Amino acid sequence: MSKVSGSNGGDSKNTLYCSFCGKSQHEVRKLIAGPTVFICDECVELCMDIIREENKSSMVKSRDGVPTPQDIIKVLDEYVIGQRQAKKILSVAVHNHYKRLAHASKNGEVELAKSNIMLVGPTGCGKTYLAQTLARIIDVPFTMADATTLTEAGYVGEDVENIILKLLQSADYNVERAQRGIVYIDEVDKISRKSDNPSITRDVSGEGVQQALLKIMEGTVASVPPQGGRKHPQQEFLQVDTTNILFICGGAFAGLDKIISARGEKTSIGFGASVKSQDDRRVGEVLRELEPEDLVKFGLIPEFIGRLPVLATLEDLDEDALIQILSEPKNALIKQYQRLFEMEDVELNFHEDALREIARKAIVRKTGARGLRSIMEKILLDTMFELPTLEGVREVVISEEVVRGSARPLYIYADRQEEKANASA
């Protein structure tokens, strides 16, 4: 029962308790009664959060049971700022891929081919995060591989089959489920051919890896040991068909913008010749003109590019986009640190100009959104060190001067109305 009688006086004589978390009616705002149980407002909110998360993963489906591109992009917008064109390309490609799988068993004259995806964009612009969010929306197994650790079979390093093994592990060794998963291969620009001409010596971590990836990306039955690698050659192998696995490759491709710009320049002589100024466009703007031939010049082999028919380029993030990333998404950095401070019963607030200064610092570092956390850690380090031992602090305020390093955070105490700047120390 959730009703307790006590002998400590009238207040505790008929105290009611939540049947789920055990809190009394005095500890919560509302206690809702059922036939034999009680539930508090906090447990109701928790249940609603769980239901919302489940609804998000299942989403509103189209007639064939696949999320529509509009549904996919709507959820992507909640987590990833900007990159509208890349989101549109991704949402259509993923929708078509899983629609193809939904109709695979039906008889038809036209066989739909798989469309793997190549993401190209500056570092820290959201390539990896887009792929992770996509897998969460579709609710399929997802794994991420680093192309720089891959080598040809027989050499020290990871085999490409290890990627399929990781996918199988994320599917709890359910082969059927793994065969519908998503694989994201990061840093794919680092496996480019070391020179334009085929070399007589083996390039085991560059072109060799591209050759090894061809078959699993196109579709093959990979033999995967349950415990990985070449360590247990005697054990029985699992057979995983990669035909329906969606491969997304991503890379920063530093210097690719120069290749694109050079292709766009046409030299002419004589009186009608136009004088070209140096291309001063941002990297993201130049990348919009990307063609497969540019990736071949960069060092990817034509067969590899042919397995990635969908090309999506991402913009480099400007100041406004970085400010949005700091504060707007559901798991924004500011919200994460505010939650951390809430655990100490302290409110954390940032001035608008402080956020702008943080964004400027990230742009100077050329690390994109990835550099925001390290900047935040540096700003809040001393405060997070001192806070657990300070008493009475109600609020911490971060200004532009604090971000620049010329001032300390402002501490506002609960037991005093005056504001105290922790300037000396």
UniProtKB/Swiss-Prot annotation:
Q: Which key words tag this protein in UniProt?
A: ATP-binding, Chaperone, Metal-binding, Nucleotide-binding, Zinc
Job description of the protein: ATP-dependent specificity component of the Clp protease. It directs the protease to specific substrates. Can perform chaperone functions in the absence of ClpP.
What span is annotated as the signal peptide, if there is one?
Answer: none
Q: Which GO terms describe its cellular component?
A: HslUV protease complex
Protein name, as recorded: ATP-dependent Clp protease ATP-binding subunit ClpX
Looking at the keywords, is ATP-binding present? yes
One GO MF annotation is:
zinc ion binding
* Protein's gene: clpX
Subunit field text: Component of the ClpX-ClpP complex. Forms a hexameric ring that, in the presence of ATP, binds to fourteen ClpP subunits assembled into a disk-like structure with a central cavity, resembling the structure of eukaryotic proteasomes.
Q: Which residues bind ATP?
A: P122, T123, G124, C125, G126, K127, T128, Y129
Identify the PROSITE patterns for this entry. CLPX_ZB (PS51902)
Provide the transmembrane region boundaries: none
Keyword hit for Nucleotide-binding: yes
> Of which family is this protein a member?
Belongs to the ClpX chaperone family.
Q: Name one Pfam family in it.
A: zf-C4_ClpX
Q: Please give the superkingdom of this protein's source.
A: Bacteria
Q: Which residues form the ClpX-type ZB domain?
A: 6-59
InterPro entries named in the record: AAA+_ATPase, ATP-dep_Clp_protease_ClpX, ATPase_AAA_core, Clp_ATPase_C, Clp_protease_ATP-bd_su_ClpX, ClpX_bact, P-loop_NTPase, Znf_CppX_C4
Q: What does the entry list as the binding residues for Zn(2+)?
A: C18, C21, C40, C43
Which organism is this entry from?
Answer: Rhizobium johnstonii (strain DSM 114642 / LMG 32736 / 3841) (Rhizobium leguminosarum bv. viciae)
GO terms of biological process kind: cell division; proteolysis involved in protein catabolic process
